[in-house]
């Protein structure tokens, strides 16, 4: 069924020293397994990670050349936001346009997409409060129980649709140059 090609061992937001040990263990005992990681600091181990997502504050460390090299090697590179930065983000107090901007930024920077850590990690009563501990309101979820959407999700989806349109147009433009 192709599960091995789709599976990833996730190692998120860990110091490089811990990542190096884990990667060495994986390479030794299960070299066929691929690794995904969200990284929240500049890191020298990105070349060893099949599916890497830097936090937006470090996204500029991935030049167009680096992204092309990773893509040619079969690696995926997205970026993410989490409980930081305050802007742009998808918090309940964020201007809705910020959520849409996230997909457009991914396209503009040449990333393969955008990583969102939580879709529906609901708090006790998400219809009454979107707060979870000290995290910004709404960080844990984009949709509500019972099939309820949110303006944050709808605008993020719009931005991801824009991302996909841009990706398709770029592909058509490349093919047109080759043909024509």
Language model segments and positions:
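Catalytic-core regions of glycoside hydrolase
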Residues: 1-127
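Aromatic- and carboxylate-lined catalytic core of secreted/periplasmic carbohydrate-active enzymes
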Residues: 87, 105-180
């Amino acid at each position: 069924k192709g599960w091995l090609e789709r599976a990833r061992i996730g190692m998120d937001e860990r110091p490089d020293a811990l990542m190096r040990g884990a990667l060495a263990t994986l390479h030794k005992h299960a070299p066929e397994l691929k690794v995904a990681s969200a990284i929240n600091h500049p890191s020298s181990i990105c070349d060893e990670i099949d599916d890497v997502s830097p936090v937006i504050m470090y996204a500029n460390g991935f030049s167009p050349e680096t992204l092309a090299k990773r893509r040619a090697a079969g690696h995926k590179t997205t970026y993410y936001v989490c409980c930081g930065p305050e802007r742009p983000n998808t918090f309940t107090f964020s201007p809705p346009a910020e959520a849409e901007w996230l997909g457009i930024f991914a396209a503009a920077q040449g990333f393969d997409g955008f990583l969102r850590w939580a879709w529906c990690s609901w708090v006790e009563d998400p219809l009454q409060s979107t707060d979870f501990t000290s995290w910004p309101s709404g960080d844990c979820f984009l949709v509500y129980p019972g099939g309820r959407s949110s303006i944050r999700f709808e605008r993020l989806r719009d931005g991801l649709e824009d991302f996909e349109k841009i990706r398709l147009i770029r592909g058509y433009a490349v093919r047109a140059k080759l043909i024509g």
